[in-house]
Amino acid sequence: MGAFLDVSESLTGRRWIGPSLEEDRLAEAMARDARLDRALALTLVRRGIGIDQAPGFLDPRLRDLLPDPLTLRDMGPAADRFLQAVQRGERIAVFADYDVDGGASAALLLTWLRRMGRNATLYIPDRIEEGYGPNEPAMARLAAAHDLIVCVDCGTLSHGPIAAAAGADVIVLDHHMGGETLPDCVAVVNPNRQDESGDLGHLCAAGVVFLLLVEANRRLKAQGQAGPDLMAMLDLVALATVADVAPLTGVNRALVRQGLVIMAKRQRPGLAALADIAALNTAPSAYHLGYVLGPRVNAGGRVGQADLGARLLATDDPHEAQALAERLNAHNIERREIEAGVQAAAMAQAEGRGDGPLAWAAGDGWHPGVVGIVAARLKEATQRPAVVIALDGDIGKGSARSVPGVDIGAAIHRLAGEGLLLRGGGHRMAAGLTVERDRLPAAMERLSDLLARQGAGATGPRDLPLDGLLMPKAARTDLVESIEKAGPFGAAAPSPRFAFSDLTVAMQRIVGNGHLKIAFNDGMGGRLDAIAFGAAEGPLARLLPGSGRFHIAGRLEINTWQGRRTVQLQLEDAAPALRR
């Protein structure tokens, strides 16, 4: 297949790939037979959705997609012990990770327990002092004062710390990759255990917790007792799923779609307060979960107090919610300032290493709370898997982020097994690691080799998939609303990207923090407003008035300002329009 619009190398060095003739034919038939907008039909066809599947895809229902919780190993013993502790009034502790998934998972349990008239102790370790996951001193202290400890979003590899919880039962609800053996405890419910053969590995921890609560409610119903309303808690599952970059496919897509509906009702004081502080005055989307609310919930665990996010998500008190939201917002501002310095240093260091399969950087004094975000930025900038490590004395603690098709979690897990890391683990798109300073070069060299075997760092122009060609006059709010029926969009479910051909630049200016605001004309009365985030110093800055005609590509969105809704393009790429 030739390059779409003959763009074999764009301003950002990419080759444009558009729909095939067969995809065009199928989309035409789907649009006609299912009475869909052609752009929506093409979006569905490009994602492998046939006409028979389209109705179910456009209206995903949990009752059709939610799996039986008991398909997960150890779910039965976990539900038995959890419900037993609740009904006997035993002392329960929740040990959670300090990120959004951990906080939302903890908030799910705390909310459900509160609706059942029970309370639980929340424990979230300090990122710097204790690190990720259960540790022996904390587990021993909790075991001395509790009958049951539920570890969420952590614990699968915590053999020693869980053994230290003598005197208390332990349940693990997790989704990180498991090892060859499991901790000795009541249950390890994890779709990514090595002995799991199901297709639920894409669930985040909050999704696993939700399934436990579904099973608990089912058992309560069998006993003639109504359980708490789980549908009202789907806002937490949606937030965790998007913020943890879990694939928005299958049941995850239904969980997020319904969770966004619940969130729009503003029934959870913490999320309502956070939305107000973030000036989010429209119905939330998956984008808002990942880039507006998620970072603020995460900020406490990154640079502040680890339990702030979970407390915000769990509280029923509007006054407490407001106070916590203000603290988290302040921490998020601090996080941005810290992140900017680390990012500049990491980008320069990685650039100096050249173009290998892995982009990595390490530095003394870097804040461990921001290395994950900086790794994500480095991955986006280089389109390669990235690792960023904060060094402190002889030890480095880092985060890894990957690109589609390259399993960073498996590679990190293998490095730990080979002794090149003190510890490490994660999932396909993200992982964490701890490494000795003197082993760092060897570890990164080995990781680079493992990732290269998966195709990381392949040379040549990168492909930019496009879902079709539109005219500026077609970019209306009703078209965007139609396309959004294929959402929510996110990991493994990207929003459709369209091209617009042969346009001139009518206006360009820099806005905000280095963003480009551009207006395009097509010479036939059509105009398209666009924004290119962070592009003021990049190749797209060549889009200047009077600089010629261009093909452009990006994602359409509705921009709401002072009650007025307009369409704008999130501009991702452009190329000179070659006249024939």
Protein language model annotation of sequence segments:
Residues G18, I124, V172, V188-N190, ...:
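Structural signal for conserved beta-strand scaffold positions within catalytic alpha/beta enzyme cores
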